[in-house]
């Protein structure tokens, strides 16, 4: 059986046994797509099959895309990881560096409690609110996950450095060079309406989320289940580069494949080393550098044997394996405690 056939067999079994409902799993080796598996259905009615062009909510997988934009600006000399944010951002009050924003050690992880979800449609307003944040911890000391604020903080730094709005920057620096057609942060309404919904089991309960743009977003987290926000056009049209991205797995995989041979590298190997080496914090998700999560292959802590990228709520992920020159992306639509997202990469490596 071919490698792709083995993957399809594994994914189909996950659907047949009720562990998953609909998935995309894409793998590139250097510049060649070696697995393009689209399995299952868009919802529990099982009437519409998942295809390569279906677009899914990718939640925090968006953070890796946002980080790449910052690294592009840094490589061009327009941002310095060690420079104060206020050097680039007029009116920014917190005494933190660009690197502390990227590494989530800035202590700016909590949005003001008076924000409402419709505010996320207005980039300039959200950027102005980031200016007012005060660190809740001593900057540079502890890693604390910046669930939502990361996107506006890091994203606006890239915008200020380039002189362009976020969506133009994404289009010109990532989508056009790589030929991506299904990646959006702040999707147009006609795209938002077609995004695959996240479906769940009745007993899954992350809280009492009310899909209402007049509800407050408090304590650094949208009141759950978090996915319900991204089951609305309001969520999908939000320009929130920490969590509101929508994409096909193919486009996410191409982004990471650019680091190992697909078309033109978005950043150089030297810049990638800076992104992973200059700021290394060990977290519950492995190591974290400037905007990327990463882990070492074979317990060899050298940066030519690293797997980096970002995962997202509900199991979406995009990663690059520099040792084996592989890139991966995974999308899924079933919110379940039986998910395969924690094991699919290990299973794939066994198939090689």
Model-derived features with residue positions:
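Short, surface-exposed loop or secondary-structure junction motifs
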Residues: 32, 95-302
